Amino acid sequence: MKPLIVLNLKTYLEGTGEGAVRIARACKEVGEASGIEIAIAPQFCDIYRVASQVDVPVYSQHLDGVGAGSFTGHAFAKCIKDAGAVGTLINHSECRLKLADIEASVTAAKGEGLRTIICTNNIATTAAAAALGPDYVAVEPPELIGSGIPVSKADPEVVTGSVAAVERIDPAVKVLCGAGISKGEDLKAAIELGSVGVLLASGIVKAKDPKAALEDLVSLI
């Protein structure tokens, strides 16, 4: 099974507007050359821009568990899907939700056929998230996000423990590894610890050459 790489553009200027399109093209080119699925999660306003210009899997950075109607300021599943997204992040550490809201978001996303990635911060929350039946959980200790120190080195037990916990609860759910991921050795270590891929951001988005950074990321797989 080839790993999954999900690149979160957050609200970085480098990944905004046409910058999002340029990085998406790099994801497509490196993904095709390596045979590895590389998805991208742009800002809401760039989902359609990216999806309509680049043939690459696009994820939303967030999704609210509401439908059409009187929900000013919310992002609902059908709108996100119609914009061109194939999946969504839920409960990123920079956009945290209560458990009931996470469940509502997962249900709404599944209703539109969107893939779901619930972000978690430790083994206990990973286990709780797995019980909601997402496609993936992405375990990311917040203190390591953007640090350049990969979780696979700083806290490998949180990855192996999360993999074991998810396997007990729902073997259909897969585990991604996040926080501090930026190099080929980080992805290789994440896979060796039992995850099926990585969720990452600044190590690629803010690199001088995002395509070269992506090529390094997949170089050991």
UniProtKB/Swiss-Prot annotation:
Substrate binds at residues 8-10, 145, 180, 201-202. GO terms for cellular component: cytoplasm. It is found in: Cytoplasm. Its EC number is 5.3.1.1. Gene3D superfamilies: Aldolase class I. PROSITE patterns: TIM_1, TIM_2. Pathway: Carbohydrate biosynthesis; gluconeogenesis; Carbohydrate degradation; glycolysis; D-glyceraldehyde 3-phosphate from glycerone phosphate: step 1/1. One of its GO terms (biological process) is gluconeogenesis. The active site is at residues 92, 140. The keyword Lyase does not apply. One of its GO terms (molecular function) is triose-phosphate isomerase activity. It catalyses: D-glyceraldehyde 3-phosphate = dihydroxyacetone phosphate. Keywords: Cytoplasm, Gluconeogenesis, Glycolysis, Isomerase. It comes from the Archaea. Involved in the gluconeogenesis. Catalyzes stereospecifically the conversion of dihydroxyacetone phosphate (DHAP) to D-glyceraldehyde-3-phosphate (G3P). Homotetramer; dimer of dimers. Belongs to the triosephosphate isomerase family. This is Triosephosphate isomerase. It comes from Methanococcoides burtonii (strain DSM 6242 / NBRC 107633 / OCM 468 / ACE-M).
